[in-house]
């Protein structure tokens, strides 16, 4: 399958950074290949996203102050490339963006709205980071608990606490809950719509992911790296290397 990313104005990013973000997410939904010589291939789109990062680690829709939602969305798009050792710029970009988001979370654990919390939950799950347990995102409560505090008695979510339920906040919260569940079950990322990982693939991934926390010296790191290299390329992107520094 091939997909050609283009638009009438020959600029995917005319609307802003989210144009590049959704272009990459679209390509990766089914692992589409871009035609040889395409102007907007994966490398070009990745370059555009990473080069747009602000000095504080965040991203913005266009040039200006970093935005929590856009930063989280950028992470969702580039997360599948974190384990690509040929793209050290992606790994550094992810690290800075995660640090930026951690610093923007308030003392109660929220980012200020149901939508922002939802987008960050999706981003963290895409990176293999647990929103309920990672110390960078646990303040007086964890991020997932903070997001759920926006849910009303009618089942919907509100933009602000105490507000009326609305479709946008509820829809994004549902996506975040789905992302969290898929993370817990070692399933594909929410925007990865290829055939689901098999039971055997999930068992292999759970095995290597469980070893990552035990890496304490060069020998244990080499053993983990061998297990990583033994995986199919399709599986490697789901190894949670973002939890360690290699």
List PLM regions with ranges:
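Solenoidal tandem-repeat scaffolds enriched in leucines and small polar residues
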Residues: 19, 28-85
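Beta-rich interaction/scaffold domains
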Residues: 194-244
